[in-house]
Amino acid sequence: MAMTYHLDVVSAEQQMFSGLVEKIQVTGSEGELGIYPGHAPLLTAIKPGMIRIVKQHGHEEFIYLSGGILEVQSGNVTVLADTAIRGQDLDEARAMEAKRKAEEHISSSHGDVDYAQASAELAKAIAQLRVIELTKKAM
C-alpha cells in the first residue's frame, strides 16, 4: 500500500477536498512543487493555476486555484485557496472567451499596469483551460 497523508483544499466558499492522497502538484511562489508523504514543513504562497491531486490507488483530480496559501505539516497538508473550482465545474466556453479578451487587451495595452493586468487574466484563463483538458483526460 502506498504511503499517504491527509489533504484539505478549502476556498472561501466551501471545502473542495478532504482525504488521503499519495501526492499533490501545485505552483508555488517559487515554482512547481510536488508534495509527497514525509515532506518537510513548508508555508508558501500559491500562484493561479491548478492543483493535481493523486488520491489513494492513483486516481487523479484537478482543481483550479486562483491563488492562496499552502501549508505542509507532518502528515497534513492544507491549501487555503482564494477561489477553487473543480475541473468538471469550469466552463470551457467562458475560459476561451476570457483568454481571447486578455490577448486583445495585451495587444492594445498602453501602459505597464494594463499589460500586467491583462497578463494576469491571460494566465488565469490558460490555467483554467489546462485544468479542463486534464480533467477530460482523467475521466
Swiss-Prot record:
Q: Pfam families recorded for this chain?
A: ATP-synt_DE, ATP-synt_DE_N
The name of this protein is ATP synthase epsilon chain
Query: Which function does this protein serve?
Result: Produces ATP from ADP in the presence of a proton gradient across the membrane.
**What molecular function terms (GO) are annotated for this protein?**
ATP binding; proton-transporting ATP synthase activity, rotational mechanism
The main location is membrane
Q: Where in the cell is it found?
A: Cell inner membrane
Membrane topology listed for this record: Peripheral membrane protein
Q: Name one GO cellular component term.
A: plasma membrane
Q: How does it assemble?
A: F-type ATPases have 2 components, CF(1) - the catalytic core - and CF(0) - the membrane proton channel. CF(1) has five subunits: alpha(3), beta(3), gamma(1), delta(1), epsilon(1). CF(0) has three main subunits: a, b and c.
Q: What is the native source organism of this protein?
A: Shigella boydii serotype 18 (strain CDC 3083-94 / BS512)
What residue intervals traverse the membrane?
Answer: none
From what superkingdom does this record's organism come?
Bacteria
Q: Which family does it belong to?
A: Belongs to the ATPase epsilon chain family.
Query: What's in the keyword line of the UniProt record?
Result: ATP synthesis, Cell inner membrane, Cell membrane, CF(1), Hydrogen ion transport, Ion transport, Membrane, Transport
Q: Which PANTHER family match?
A: ATP SYNTHASE DELTA/EPSILON CHAIN, ATP SYNTHASE EPSILON CHAIN, CHLOROPLASTIC
